[in-house]
Structure formats: C-alpha cells, structure tokens
Amino acid sequence: MDQPTWKRPHRAKFAGVSDAAQQRQMPNLASIDLNLLVDLEALLQYRHITQAAQHVGRSQPAMSRALSRLRGMLKDDLLVAGSRGLVLTPLAECLTQMLPSVLDAIRQMMNLSLAPAQRRWKVTMAMPDHQAVVLLPHLLPRLHERAPHLDIVTDPLLGGALGLLEQGEIDVVVGQMGAAPLGYLRRRLYADSFTCVLRHNHPALAQEWTIEAFAALRHVAIASEPDELFGQIYDRLTKLGLQRGDPMVVSTVLTAAVLIAATDSVLVVPSRVATRVAAMLSLAVIPPPVELRPYEVALIWHERCHRDPEHRWLRGEIAAAASTAG
C-alpha cells in the first residue's frame, strides 16, 4: 500500500542509481509556474477560495483552477472540506511553515535586479556631523526622487570606518582622506577652507580682527572635526607667542552654533558649514586671522563594492549632490 504523500520518505541517492534515474524521480522544475506559489500562499493563509482570490487579485474561478493545478503538481488535496469550512491536509500544514521563507527568498532575489527606483534597500554612510549638514540637504531630495524606497542611515563616528567598509557594515565614508589605502577607492567631492563664526553682535566685530583678538576668545570645537585643524591653529599661535586654552568640545554642529549665538566664543568650521549655520541663526562669518590650509572632502569605499551596479549608482548620486553643495 502506498504511503500518503506527506509521509513518503526522502529519496536518497544510492549507489548504482544513475543521475538520469534520479532526475526522472524528481519534479520538473521547469514546468512549475511560480505564480502558483503566490496562489498557494493565499490559499493556505485564508483557507477560503474566494478570499484568497481577492487577496491576489484573481477571480474565484481562476483561483479554483489554480488550486486544481496545485493539487496535481503536489499530488495532494491541500484543502479539504471540514465542518467549519476548508481545512489543511498534513502536507499543507507543512507547506504553511515552509512557503513564507521560500517566497521571501524569491522576492529578494528578484528585488536585486530592480532599478533603484523600484528597490527597497538601505545605505549606511559614515560622515562627520558638519559634513552631513553640507551634503544631506542636497543628497536626500535627489534620492527621494530617484529611489523613493531607499533608506539612508548616517553615522557621525569615523573611528574604525575602513574596517566597517571592508566588513560591509557601512557602505561609504564621506570625510577628509588624502589618499585611499590599499583595497579602498577614493573620489574627490569638493574642496573647502576654514572660516570663523561668531554671534552677529559680537564685540570683536567692532574691533580690528587680529590674531591677538582671535587668540583671546574662548573657542568651541566639534568632536568630529579633524584634530589637525586645531593643530594648525595651536601651532600658529604658539609660534607667535600667543596662548590659547583648549576648546570647549561639543558633539554636533548645531550645538556648537547655538553656543556661538549665545556666547562670546568663536567657532572655526569649513566655509560651507559656516554659510549654512549662519543663515539659520543669524551669525557672522569672517575669515580667520591665521592662515589655515584648505582641505578636500572625499568619498571612500571598499573595492568589494566597486563594480556593484547599485553602489556605483549611489556614488554617482553622492558626487552629483556634492557638486551642488557650494
């Protein structure tokens, strides 16, 4: 007597049985319509032909035909009449557990081939807070228009960023890096210089803006700014015999700007950052009385993603946004 379909043992491959014989015993995958799996998912969920048909946008007769095809393909009734409607056979109960993961895998596989505008995906960008203030207002509108299902996550901490790029924990880094290490690639986004920000009615603005006046002020710094910036300032002041205390360090550019608006402190930031925060809080922007080297902001990524179409598209969008972030 034949065993029920759901109790048949797994057919292992034994010595002496040819590959051709094994293939004759297996279902022909080429003959399987993947749309039937979507119908099966709805039938198993609703256990009602009409409701399942409505869920997938089919007519009731079309869903009935799909159920008939599924029964023939799986050699099982799947749904049988019970006292309170249709009930699942043991095989159908098993498929209820298996099918969601199978369909999820198929959907994810198909999603990989979609254009950016159709894909649902996430990108993690590491960049200092003050660079995010410059870049994101130009980048996010582009991405929302061209890839509406793309989620952007930013991380202001650059420590260990190269290792995270290699591991795939983050996708790109935006920051100051003169040359990309071996295994990484670099694309210049824009150049910038440093400038000073003070409150609009700061007493120093009514006097000659000298290096002595600059050195006498309390300085505010952003934690994510490069240490070399303060090294430049400190070295120049030291050479001139001027003393300057350590700056008050805060975590974000917004906090720094609010402090500048409320105190007699001074903030040294990239010119693009200064322009944006000054417009928000009515601050004054003036050149520093000490010469500070300009710098470049670059996009860094790992070679593992270099040829990936979606990653290449993202890099192009970041570069295009940066070109308008003047």
From Swiss-Prot:
Residues 32-89 form the HTH lysR-type domain. InterPro entries: LysR-type_TF, LysR_subst-bd, SyrM_PBP2, Tscrpt_reg_HTH_LysR, WH-like_DNA-bd_sf, WH_DNA-bd_sf. CDD domains: PBP2_SyrM. It comes from the Bacteria. It holds the Pfam family LysR_substrate. Keywords: Activator, DNA-binding, Nodulation, Plasmid, Transcription, Transcription regulation. Gene3D superfamilies: Periplasmic binding protein-like II (3.40.190.10), Winged helix-like DNA-binding domain superfamily/Winged helix DNA-binding domain (1.10.10.10). GO terms for molecular function: DNA binding; DNA-binding transcription factor activity. Residues 49-68 bind DNA. PROSITE patterns: HTH_LYSR. Has two translation start codons in proximity to each other leading to a protein of 326 or 301 AA. Acts in trans to stimulate nod gene expression via nodD3 and exo gene expression via SyrA. Belongs to the LysR transcriptional regulatory family. This is HTH-type transcriptional regulator SyrM. It comes from Rhizobium meliloti (strain 1021) (Ensifer meliloti).
